[in-house]
Amino acid sequence: MPRALWTAWVWAVIILSTEGASDQASSLSCDPTGVCDGHSRSLNSIPSGLTAGVKSLDLSNNDITYVGNRDLQRCVNLKTLRLGANEIHTVEEDSFFHLRNLEYLDLSYNRLSNLSSSWFRSLYVLKFLNLLGNLYKTLGETSLFSHLPNLRTLKVGNSNSFTEIHEKDFTGLTFLEELEISAQNLQIYVPKSLKSIQNISHLILHLKQPILLVDILVDIVSSLDCFELRDTNLHTFHFSEASISEMSTSVKKLIFRNVQFTDESFVEVVKLFNYVSGILEVEFDDCTHDGIGDFRALSLDRIRHLGNVETLTIRKLHIPQFFLFHDLSSIYPLTGRVKRVTIENSKVFLVPCLLSQHLKSLEYLDLSENLMSEETLKNSACKDAWPFLQTLVLRQNRLKSLEKTGELLLTLENLNNLDISKNNFLSMPETCQWPGKMKQLNLSSTRIHSLTQCLPQTLEILDVSNNNLDSFSLILPQLKELYISRNKLKTLPDASFLPVLSVMRISRNIINTFSKEQLDSFQQLKTLEAGGNNFICSCDFLSFTQGQQALGRVLVDWPDDYRCDSPSHVRGQRVQDARLSLSECHRAAVVSAACCALFLLLLLTGVLCHRFHGLWYMKMMWAWLQAKRKPRKAPRRDICYDAFVSYSERDSYWVENLMVQELEHFNPPFKLCLHKRDFIPGKWIIDNIIDSIEKSHKTIFVLSENFVKSEWCKYELDFSHFRLFDENNDAAILILLEPIDKKAIPQRFCKLRKIMNTKTYLEWPVDETQQEGFWLNLRAAIRS
């Protein structure tokens, strides 16, 4: 028994292990190219069953704690491995040994307390390595990256425990495109630790205090292109002029991101600009100036300019003591060489006139997302301000008058590019004044609803996208590029207004079609973006768009952004794929064919009616319908005649001289209704027939060859037949005056044929001895 229990326990463990591995493997989603996604799946280990077909594996944001030697040994073709944001604390020595094709490795934000160079000894082609956010204090006992000759991006360090950088740490690295070091609590930096890297394109350094900043700059200043300092408090920063005054420098750009300055440390940074002579561009992003701008008591007066800095960018600058700030006049002289200035989202409402006049080399000025208005712009664009300014960006400020804005900028004689988008102009005046060299104007997202002659005739590029325009009828003879997307235009502009237009972007309007003739009228048009409109996929439009093979060279967003809005059965389909039926595309031909068919049908109907007495049947039907509207049976008191006699006029002699004599002069006499004698004059003959039949007890039909040729006899027969069958009585009496061949009776006398087959009829005997019996039977039939 114990042995049986032991066997069952072993099988249960095996089954559970297999199910667990299967569940983890199924948590991955892999596409046919070998890209497998397993991020955020709550995995606690690397899934088993991975094969050589896996080329990219994302296991980030899970609960993996361990990477073993066998976990990835079959992934010999793996190029990308993401293991970031897990709980990995152990990586075995040969975990990545078989990944000889690996180019991207992310081990960031785990719990690695020790790093081993053996992990990377076979990763010769590795280009990207991220080790940020782990728990290690140093980069290992030996050179960690000496086996990575092709490494181009390296990220190391953490915000707490990483405190030391040693000379061996970066040995073996000669060129890096990007190096990011997170060392907020750096305490030890051994000189020349970064000097072994001969060329660094971009260095990002997270440093809380600037104590070791100058030592690091000394090592990298000759091998670095761009230096970015993040999350640093520079309150105590002091720049030593002797440190780099005699060294050649290659740094071209400095970036300060989330850095805090004081008035004193700002002066030290300005000194750095002077002594690192290669710096051409400086950027301050989300920085804080903890000062009041009082530089007069400092040594700033000994600095005449900002070195060789040509581009200055400031974004989201915070000045807590802004309302105590000085006029900055002491720094005005430093700005004379600056050519490009960007100050975004920093609550700037005024550029003092004196500062504008000192910016004598300025060619580009961007004051986007600030508080500039016409009143403050008047002071900023004063006389002699920005004398060489060519581009001015005032996007998303507080400008309201287009006319006044243009007038205030007349002092800028060299201005050719103006961006005043995202201001609330709402309307455009009929006339405006602009600087004489204006070539580019951006009025997008300004809520204007119409365009007028206010726009300068010298424009070459105009952007009026995202407004409320429903037409474009301006003549701009020099315009080369027009951006008018996201408006309410229903058609393309007239090409005669824009003779040299080469680029037009008119997507997201309500245009429903355009033709080959319209496009051909723009003789110099090379680029057209017209997608996202409500296209009516007519036959002409589809024929044009689908038949032009070269259309894709002009329509930059063709074919995906061109969708049908109607007809309904192709709505949502790409114009390129839409198909219409023959009837939709050749409607005139279809209508013509239908009309011809209808004409032939009417002609055929007429011929058939003539051949088969159709008109006769129609007349009879109308009379029959009239009869149907009358009461089915006349009341007894309304019966005026014993019998209505239906006969042909050609048989009148027999009726009037024989039958009338025998019946009306009999005792008691019968009262007969004859059309010659008893029909009411002036009344429609059909009504006379109907009324006479209705007021007669019986209807006598005198049948002969003449009878079947009489149209009125046919009416009388039909109305009598109506009574005979609809009222189920014996109202009809047939007298066969002469033998009639049933086959000779016309087809329209179908009811006569039916009556002769279903009712007994009286034959007029030629033998006079039998005639008395005939009259006797007739009288009996009338009385019945």
UniProtKB/Swiss-Prot annotation:
Ubiquitinated at Lys-754 by PPP1R11, leading to its degradation. Deubiquitinated by USP2. GO terms for biological process: cellular response to diacyl bacterial lipopeptide; cellular response to triacyl bacterial lipopeptide; inflammatory response; innate immune response; toll-like receptor signaling pathway. Glycans are attached at residues 114, 199, 442. Disulfide bonds join 30-36, 353-382, 432-454. GO terms for cellular component: Golgi apparatus; membrane raft; phagocytic vesicle membrane; plasma membrane; receptor complex. Residues 21-587 are extracellular. The chain crosses the membrane at residues 588-608. The record marks 349 as: Interaction with bacterial lipopeptide. Residues 525-579 form the LRRCT domain. Gene3D superfamilies: Ribonuclease Inhibitor (3.80.10.10), Toll/interleukin-1 receptor homology (TIR) domain (3.40.50.10140). Cooperates with LY96 to mediate the innate immune response to bacterial lipoproteins and other microbial cell wall components. Cooperates with TLR1 or TLR6 to mediate the innate immune response to bacterial lipoproteins or lipopeptides. Acts via MYD88 and TRAF6, leading to NF-kappa-B activation, cytokine secretion and the inflammatory response. May also promote apoptosis in response to lipoproteins. This is Toll-like receptor 2. The lineage of its organism: Eukaryota, Metazoa, Chordata, Craniata, Vertebrata.
